[in-house]
Amino acid sequence: MSEHSKSIEIYGQCVDDFEVSPFESVDMLHRRSTLEKAIQELNYEERMKLLSYDMQLIKNAKNMAKHIGEIYDFSLSEEPLSQWWWHLDKVANGNISFHLSPELESDVAI
């Protein structure tokens, strides 16, 4: 299992976990940012798994924002909106919307 795959799996275990401390959940957000920086290094399966976990976090946005909000003020986040996980409060209240758009891989012939 690659280092990225391990990190994706750990992230996936965290998106539904409200039993851990909010500090550990903030670590999940940092982990997701690290994965975003390496997104071009991920293979297709890793990207799909990451997308699946992202969708679960979006589904849990309200509860996770409340959980993390015990120690983190989302309104002070300076992260770009492209890193929406740092803005779960806005995701939860519908101020950030998502659109699925296809991308053609560079080595695929049309």
Question: Predicted regions span which residues?
Answer:
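N-terminal, helix-rich and Lys/Arg-enriched segments in bacterial and organellar proteins
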Residues: 8, 12, 32, 43, ...
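Short terminal alpha-helical segments
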Residues: 1-29
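Acidic, low-complexity, intrinsically disordered interaction modules
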Residues: 28, 36-79, 83-85
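Long, contiguous secondary-structure blocks with strong helical propensity
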Residues: 24-36, 100-104
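Amphipathic alpha-helical binding modules
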Residues: 68-110
